[in-house]
Each structure stands twice: as structure tokens, then as C-alpha cells.
Design a protein with these regions (language model features):
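Alpha-helical DNA-recognition elements
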Residues: 34, 45, 63
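Short, charged recognition helix plus adjacent turn
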Residues: 9, 58-68
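Helix-turn-helix/winged-helix DNA-binding modules
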Residues: 9, 35-38, 49
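Recognition helix of helix-turn-helix/homeodomain-like DNA-binding domains
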Residues: 22-37
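Conserved hydrophobic/aromatic packing and binding residues within compact polymer-binding modules
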Residues: 3, 17-18, 28-31, 57
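DNA major-groove recognition helix of helix-turn-helix/homeodomain DNA-binding modules
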Residues: 41-56
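Short basic helix-loop element that most often maps to the first helix and adjoining turn
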Residues: 2-20, 45
Length: 68
């Protein structure tokens, strides 16, 4: 998942991301390291937050925009 890449590109901390999304910082860390998998609702939160498609977030495409 490109979560860490997107977070660093936006220059925000795990804590800021967690607070913005009403999540736990430990969960963000686990998603970034791959020790925890995000459910669909969480993937939507991340994709909406970073304004990318879920496919881009999950590295299924290199196109960050939504298919229209």
C-alpha cells in the first residue's frame, strides 16, 4: 500500500493523519508496515484524504486519479 509514500509526500506525521481521520496512530503505523490490512471503509478514508483512487493506494495502478 502507498500509504507511507502519500503521507510523506504530503509532509504529515502519522499522528496528524491519525487525528485527521479519527484513528489510532498505532493503526496507521501497522497499515504502513503491512502488519495490518485495511478494511474497505478504511481504504475509502485514505483514498478520500489523499484524493487518489483505491487502486492507486493499493498499487494496482500507477495512475493516482479516478477513472472517469
Amino acid at each position: 500500500m502507498r500509504l507511507k509514500y502519500l503521507r510523506k509526500k504530503k509532509k504529515i506525521s502519522q499522528l496528524k493523519l491519525a487525528l485527521d481521520l479519527n484513528m489510532n496512530q498505532n493503526s496507521i503505523s501497522r497499515y504502513e508496515t503491512g502488519t495490518r490490512e485495511a478494511d474497505y471503509a478504511t481504504l475509502i478514508k485514505f483514498a478520500d484524504y489523499f484524493n487518489v483512487s483505491i487502486d492507486y493506494l493499493l498499487e494496482r495502478t500507477d495512475n493516482p486519479t479516478f477513472n472517469k
